[in-house]
């Protein structure tokens, strides 16, 4: 039977951990001095006078590498619990994990063959 009072500590933690950052933002907004001007609107470059525009446009190639990294990073996060309980799980779960690993590998090989990962 599902009883909510069994999770009192969880709800208290959730409420407190939500209220503290909200209060911190509100208090800093009230106490912070409001000063606007050209210095506040310029970009900070370690004390050096900024040269040129602060907004750089990255090439799309960088985003492809970042996307591949994120895909394999998320895959690692999902495979970790499976690896920790590998001895308890059966062969069918092993086959599912193998398919789960093969799909991004096939996608990476496809992207590599198409030249999406070439930096030049």
Swiss-Prot record:
Superkingdom assignment: Eukaryota
Bilayer disposition of the protein: Multi-pass membrane protein
Family (UniProt): Belongs to the complex I subunit 3 family.
Disulfide bonds: none
Main location (coarse class): plastid
Reaction(s) this enzyme catalyzes, per UniProt: a plastoquinone + NADH + (n+1) H(+)(in) = a plastoquinol + NAD(+) + n H(+)(out); a plastoquinone + NADPH + (n+1) H(+)(in) = a plastoquinol + NADP(+) + n H(+)(out)
EC number: 7.1.1.-
Transmembrane segment boundaries: 9-29, 64-84, 88-108
Protein name in UniProt: NAD(P)H-quinone oxidoreductase subunit 3, chloroplastic
Keyword annotations of the record: Chloroplast, Membrane, NAD, NADP, Plastid, Plastoquinone, Quinone, Thylakoid, Translocase, Transmembrane, Transmembrane helix, Transport
Catalytic class of the enzyme: translocase
Compartments (UniProt record): Plastid, Chloroplast thylakoid membrane
A GO biological-process term: photosynthesis, light reaction
InterPro entries from the UniProt entry: NAD(P)H_OxRDtase_bac/plastid, NADH_UbQ/plastoQ_OxRdtase_su3, NDAH_ubi_oxred_su3_sf
Function field: NDH shuttles electrons from NAD(P)H:plastoquinone, via FMN and iron-sulfur (Fe-S) centers, to quinones in the photosynthetic chain and possibly in a chloroplast respiratory chain. The immediate electron acceptor for the enzyme in this species is believed to be plastoquinone. Couples the redox reaction to proton translocation, and thus conserves the redox energy in a proton gradient.
Keyword Transmembrane: yes
Gene Ontology molecular function: NADH dehydrogenase (ubiquinone) activity; quinone binding
Keyword Membrane: yes
Oligomer status and interactors: NDH is composed of at least 16 different subunits, 5 of which are encoded in the nucleus.
């Amino acid at each position: 039977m599902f009883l909510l009072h069994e999770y009192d500590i969880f709800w208290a933690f959730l409420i407190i951990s939500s209220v503290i950052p909200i209060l911190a933002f509100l208090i800093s907004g009230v106490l912070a001095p409001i000063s606007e001007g050209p210095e506040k609107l310029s970009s900070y470059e370690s004390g050096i006078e900024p040269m040129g525009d602060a907004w750089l446009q990255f090439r799309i190639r960088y985003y492809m590498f970042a996307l591949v990294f994120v895909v394999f990073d998320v895959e690692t996060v999902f495979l970790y619990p499976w690896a920790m309980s590998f001895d308890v799980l059966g062969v069918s779960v092993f086959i599912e994990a193998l398919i789960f690993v093969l799909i991004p590998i096939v996608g990476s090989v496809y992207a590599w063959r198409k030249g999406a990962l070439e930096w030049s």
